[in-house]
Regions:
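Hydrophobic alpha-helical segments and their helix-loop boundaries in membrane
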Residues: 20-254
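N-terminal secretory/membrane targeting signals
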Residues: 1-20
């Protein structure tokens, strides 16, 4: 008797649950930008190519952030500061990456604003297709990357064009995007390392002076880094190092 009663109660709970689920189903789809998750017949959730496109963009956003924006140069230079000061975990990596991200937003904001107005808004309003959206969205980034390489006379572009066995382009529009990205990454590495040399020089002088003084005093077993660290921090604070580095990084993209 108890088994039959338990079975009846179990079936009743399941029936009630299905009824509640059916009554709580939404009648409208999720409102994502230019993505319709409910088909026109109201038959349930579908996954169109637009959703796949959004997921692809989200997946590739870290690579996009590193390879096509100012993030690479800023992150490397900020890491060089920590190494030049002989600091191991201060500031922590999360803080350095967070500061690099915000500085990237400041330097890239005009470019992102153009992409938003010329590419995203027309696509959201269904005025353009995805092909035109890509062309309009990639154009400001191409201009930004090409402008940053103007100081090196675009040597990196010529290098990767020759590696790819492409003919010499007549103008900027004939440079393939993947060649431009690779050239931009190489250029950013070169610029970041040049800035790193300038950052390291004054602190190397302090290390040499401290090491020479310790040698003259016969204190060979005492690590020079332990003694030079307070002097490095004192120099960095006296010259307002964080402000100088931040302003120098931002101005280097103008």
């Amino acid at each position: 008797m108890s088994k039959k009663l338990s079975l009846v109660l179990f079936l009743g709970v399941i029936n009630f649950s299905f009824a509640q689920t059916k009554s709580l189903q939404p009648t409208t789809g999720l409102n994502f930008p230019f993505v319709d998750l409910v088909n026109s017949t109201g038959g349930g959730i579908v996954f169109p190519l637009q959703l796949l496109f959004i997921l692809t963009i989200i997946t590739l956003s870290p690579a996009f952030l590193v390879l096509m924006t100012s993030f690479l140069r800023i992150a490397i230079v900020l890491d060089f500061i920590r190494r030049a000061l002989s600091l191991q975990q201060s500031p922590p990596n999360q803080l350095i990456m967070g500061l690099a991200l915000f500085l990237t937003l400041f330097t890239m904001w005009p470019t992102f604003n153009i992409i938003y107005k010329d590419a995203y808004v027309p696509l959201k309003d269904s005025k353009i297709g995805f092909n035109e959206f890509y062309d309009r969205g990639i154009a400001p980034l191409r201009n930004f990357m090409y402008k940053q390489m103007s100081n090196s006379k675009h040597e990196e572009i010529r290098l990767f064009m020759s590696i790819s066995n492409y003919s010499r382009p007549k103008n900027f529009s004939e440079v393939p995007t993947h060649v431009l990205i690779a050239s931009f990454v190489l250029h950013e590495l070169k610029v970041a390392f040049k800035m790193g040399i300038l950052i390291f020089l004054p602190f190397i002088v302090i290390d040499i002076i401290v090491a020479a003084v310790l040698m003259a005093m016969g204190m060979i077993m005492l690590p020079p880094v332990m003694i030079s660290l307070p002097f490095k921090l004192m120099l960095f604070v006296m010259v307002d190092g964080w402000t100088l580095i931040t302003s120098g990084l931002v101005k280097s993209f103008m």
